[in-house]
Amino acid sequence: MAELTISSDEIRSAIANYTSSYSAEASREEVGVVISAADGIAQVSGLPSVMANELLEFPGGVIGVAQNLEADRVGVVVLGNYELLKEGDQVRRTGDVLSIPVGEAFLGRVINPLGQPIDGLGEIASEEDRVLELQAPTVLERQPVEEPLATGIKAIDAMTPIGRGQRQLIIGDRKTGKTAVCVDTILNQKANWETGDKTKQVRCIYVAIGQKGSTIAALRKTLEEQGALEYTTIVAAPASDAAGFKWLAPFAGAALAQHWMYQGNHVLVIYDDLTKQAEAYRAISLLLRRPPGREAYPGDVFYLHSRLLERAAKLSDDLGAGSITALPIIETKANDVSAFIPTNVISITDGQVFLESDLFNRGIRPAINVGVSVSRVGGAAQTKGMKKVAGSLRLDLAAFRDLEAFATFASDLDAASKSQLERGQRLVQLLIQSENAPQAVEYQIISLWLAGEGAFDNVPVEDVRRFESELHEYLGSNAAQVYEQIAGGAQLSDESKETLLKATEDFKSAFQTTDGTPVINEPEVEALDAGQVKKDQLTVSRKVSKK
């Protein structure tokens, strides 16, 4: 048997190698303790090094966001079921600031404000994580808003145009069609998406805040049926969710939008609606014992919305020329736009579309009040063709509204006023659109130009919308080249105008009104000159009887 020999030098070397790599440091971990948990807020003691907006982990997988950083405790907004927490539970830091996963795979999906899928279609492959609270682009990183974003709604595209990178407020009472306007805008991006051209495509993000789950499901179904879900992401924080989710939902949508914007893409974000976010933030602030201000809102509620909406921008060419267009929705009470939140958001945005319940109830939909609605970008966000035909539209409608109010008290109107009143009535009908039926820009331009030329003047008011629809079908077959020219960005040429007028007259000769009478322009009768009038001389004689 071989003799076992052990070298003392080898043993000494092995011990030296082990001791040189050994570290006597103990792992350090901050652990806090729950003092109380109620109404979605947890008070935690300890955690002296916690960061603002840091994610904290509670037992059972519940997470929270650190908000109030006080000397002896931390106020935490619980994102989950706070009823699972109890006094004495341990709380651990994660070291991560609030962020969500982002990526191309989020298109067509429904997620919560943490980026987790809630549509039952499985996990989503993310490209990276993006912090929710990011600094908005600086002044030097932006460029002016000059590229139109067509909504498909004539009243908006003609009078209050929206450009890529703009923030346009949609404001009005409940049940006035605010969501319908935004959904139509999403549907109108389908044609651009199908081109496959990155410079034309618009990715859409719909942020649902405090809505019923059934309403969100119905919206998703509408987008899917119309073929718009493939380029849309829905961020949902329904009414049943905790206030923390409703507060964070818009920031989650903005983070996802910024990811695509910095890749050079164009994004449309709809916040439906920021009134509910402000109410959720008010509830959180009051529960955190922050001092209340006007209408019990905290002092930084303006900053809440300004730092969110300032993230909408058109980036400079050096940064890829991407854009975020924001359509925030605000709900008013009794058309009161002077309330705290409406005035805040009006001062932040680049214009507003004001929807009025009286117009909505009269069947004028979208119920846009032209006098109050405005776009601070204006004609810069319109094509040349639209700018030319829509130049006087706002003034014509304003004059019609004044004349309409006067006509209710005046019995006799002169011929010019009657003509203006009748044309205004037809113009109002022309601007009415059905829900989920956006109209391409070339169709809008042709309709508005023909209206300005008086093509609708002798069409009965109740037949105007049907006349327009059937006229476009006819022109699509007989003047298709005109549509193609306008879609390519060209203005209406003299030749195109003659083609449209001739085709319209031909269509009128065959159009039947509701009562079955044809619509034909009566030829004007020219007055004869004095020399052309045949004069008859009449001789009157009186017979005198003889006596």
UniProtKB/Swiss-Prot annotation:
Q: Which PROSITE patterns match?
A: ATPASE_ALPHA_BETA
CDD domains under this entry? ATP-synt_F1_alpha_C, ATP-synt_F1_alpha_N, F1-ATPase_alpha_CD
Gene Ontology CC annotations of this record: plasma membrane; proton-transporting ATP synthase complex
State where ATP binds: G172, D173, R174, K175, T176, G177, K178, T179
Where does this protein chiefly localize? Answer: membrane
Q: According to its UniProt record, which reaction does this protein catalyse?
A: ATP + H2O + 4 H(+)(in) = ADP + phosphate + 5 H(+)(out)
**Stored InterPro entries:** ATP_synth_asu-like_sf, ATP_synth_asu_C, ATP_synth_asu_C_sf, ATP_synth_F1_a_nt-bd_dom, ATP_synth_F1_asu, ATPase_a/bsu_AS, ATPase_F1/V1/A1_a/bsu_N, ATPase_F1/V1/A1_a/bsu_N_sf
Site feature: Required for activity = S373
Q: Does the keyword Phosphoprotein apply?
A: no
- Cellular localisation: Cell membrane
In this record, what's one Pfam family? ATP-synt_ab
Class of the enzyme per the UniProt entry, highest EC level:
translocase
Q: Which UniProt keywords apply?
A: ATP synthesis, ATP-binding, Cell membrane, CF(1), Hydrogen ion transport, Ion transport, Membrane, Nucleotide-binding, Translocase, Transport
Gene Ontology MF terms in the entry: ADP binding; ATP binding; proton-transporting ATP synthase activity, rotational mechanism
Topological relation to the membrane, as annotated: Peripheral membrane protein
Function according to Swiss-Prot or TrEMBL: Produces ATP from ADP in the presence of a proton gradient across the membrane. The alpha chain is a regulatory subunit.
What family is it from?
A: Belongs to the ATPase alpha/beta chains family.
Quaternary structure and interacting proteins, as annotated:
F-type ATPases have 2 components, CF(1) - the catalytic core - and CF(0) - the membrane proton channel. CF(1) has five subunits: alpha(3), beta(3), gamma(1), delta(1), epsilon(1). CF(0) has three main subunits: a(1), b(2) and c(9-12). The alpha and beta chains form an alternating ring which encloses part of the gamma chain. CF(1) is attached to CF(0) by a central stalk formed by the gamma and epsilon chains, while a peripheral stalk is formed by the delta and b chains.
List the protein's name.
Answer: ATP synthase subunit alpha
Q: Which organism is it from?
A: Corynebacterium glutamicum (strain R)
Q: Which gene encodes it?
A: atpA
